Amino acid sequence: MPKSSSSLESLKHQALGPNSEAASEAFEALTAIGTEEVAQFYLGLLETAQRGWRYRAAMGLMHLGDARAVAPLLRAIQLPETRGCNGTLVYVLTQFDCRHLLKELFQMVFQQGYEAQLMAMMAIEDQDFEYSIEDAAYIQQQWAVAQLAPSESLLELGLENIRELVEEL
């Protein structure tokens, strides 16, 4: 039975409220409802500055299997204010079809924090990709730059591991 509009509005209000336990329960209920209105609500929250809302919305979209989340997730991952705290967003992104996102995933490996880098590397290792010669050249050029002054997190991931992924292109 579909929820009434007033019930959905009440759950949305609760999801954005100050009580974290009630908010978490509201997000779970909204995800279980899973209507187009819920999906639109979640898509809008991917753009918010509020990290907790953004993460819960991303997880909800993942559970709904809504591939419309891919472009907003990419934008949210690339925001300077999410650097260092966007591993969950990268994880959710990699649960969708990423076959055309090889260049973007390598950019995450080269430019993001450890958790996001790790999630992106796992996706690169696990998924099959379709990419152009230009994409491969761009990735190789970015890899050359990253090796000049590798970040601590790149060193932790293992330069040899990354090199192997790049050389497979």
Model region roles, listed by residue range:
Residues 3-6, 15-25, 48-56, 80-88, ...:
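Generic helix N-cap/helix-start motif at coil->alpha-helix transitions
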Residues 1-14, 33-47, 66-79, 98-110, ...:
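Amphipathic alpha-helical scaffolding segments comprising HEAT/armadillo-like alpha-solenoid repeats
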Residues 145-169:
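Terminal, low-structured helical/coil segments at or just beyond the last alpha-helical repeat
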Residues 107-117, 121-134:
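Amphipathic protein-protein interaction modules
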Residues 20, 32-35, 51, 63-67, ...:
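Alpha-helix boundary/capping and short turn/kink residues
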Residues 24-27, 43, 57-58, 74, ...:
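Hydrophobic core positions within HEAT/HEAT-like alpha-solenoid repeats
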Residues 24-62:
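N-terminal interaction modules that seed assembly of large macromolecular complexes
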